[in-house]
Amino acid sequence: MKRGSSLRGALVLGVALLVSACGVLEPRVPEARPEVPKQWPLPPTTEGASPVSPAPTAAPETQAVVDVGWRDFFVDPKLEELVARSLANNRDFRIAVLNVERARELYRIQRADRVPSVGAVGTMVRQGDGVPVTEAFSADVAVTGFELDLFGRVRSLSQSALQSYFAEEQARRSAQLSLIAEVANVYLTLAADQDQVRLARQTLSTREEAFRITQKRHEFGAVSALDVYQSRTQVETARADLARYEGQVAQDLNALTLLVGGTVEPALKPAGFDPNVTGLYALPPGLPSDVLQRRPDVLAAEHRLRAANANIGAARAAFFPSITLTGTVGVASDELSGLFDGGTGTWSFVPRINLPIFEGGRLRANLGAARADRDIALADYEGAIQRGFREVADTLALTSTLAAQRHALEQLVEAAGQAEEIARVRYEAGRDSYLTRLEAQRTLYVAEQTLITTRLAEQSNRITLYKVLGGGWTEGTR
């Protein structure tokens, strides 16, 4: 410990701290080459397909799907309430939110290494061994273990932590988007299965009445026993379907309860399947594939690539000398009352240089591992873009074909209903066999079931398109 001017010591320490520079060894982030077309293939045009109509508040010319809030996308108040509850209560989504908070705090820890750690220390020493007791007092302001970032190691580690934080934030957005889509799909599935229950119950009632009439006619010898048993098979088929769909409704409700994170009151259950439960902003012709860059999973992969690239800079910097500074500025005195008198100033300056000479290949292995991690992250980034392109292309391909299927099935149900009525009249008049009427009933019932399923698939595809284009991460304006 040297005594002298405290001002002189402060200047020496300050100059040493200002020496720190940022000579960065971090390489440039490699360019991703996912090799995807610049535009998605146009969906097939099918006769009878109707274009997807926008929501009432849509402004397709000025606003991209990715910017449409989920409250603007869904028009069913019940569904909006369930989505809001899921975002507040869902445990899996809560984990994603907490991961973001954790990554933010880790970044703050890493960032703190870029500035000196300053602390104040006060000491009193009293000693004596058969002689008069002596006392010594001191008060110091110390900078301990501050690394001069001459080659950017600390900066690279801080940048890596920052990019990891950004990646977690995008992962949270992706989790939110997936949760919203899943809640909407389960809600629609519940509504569709409820329609299937109503259809099966109505069909069962109709067939039971027809079975009773057939039994009466058999008692009078008007029909054979074969007609009776064929009628009974129709009854039991509808009864089995009713039980199956009631079970599916119960499972749908359980799934919705889990996603929402609480009880779903009867008032929030769908009254039935509403084809207008979602609105979708019309996509402009030739939508470019670079909108994938706004998908949260793609952005998360990009930030992970940048984090891995920054780690290469830190691994390279480890090959070079590192300088760590420890210094104090303070006062010392034999008497507490004179601690801050003139001439009591002290300072110390202890630089430490660490020069790696022999590490047994550890530093080179660390660099190789960092490069491998960067290459893995690059491949994952390119893969995320390719997966996103395929998801959007597949969903666009189904948009018009599902609309065409629904339109054809609506015509089929209408025609099958007329055919079933004619078959009933002709059978009761004795002009056709019961087998003809039976086939007409089956055709109508299957067509009605398939129409419900296709309507569900069409609406689910709309939700999927909204999701794969990156929409749903904002709440919206309504």
Segments the model singles out, each with a brief description of its role:
Residues K2-A88, S158-L162, E246-Q293, L299, ...:
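Terminal intrinsically disordered/low-complexity segments used for targeting and assembly
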Residues E208, T237-P266, A315, Q411-L469:
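Short segments within alpha-helical structural elements
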Residues R94-I95, R111, L148-Q176, L226, ...:
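Sec/SRP-type N-terminal targeting helices
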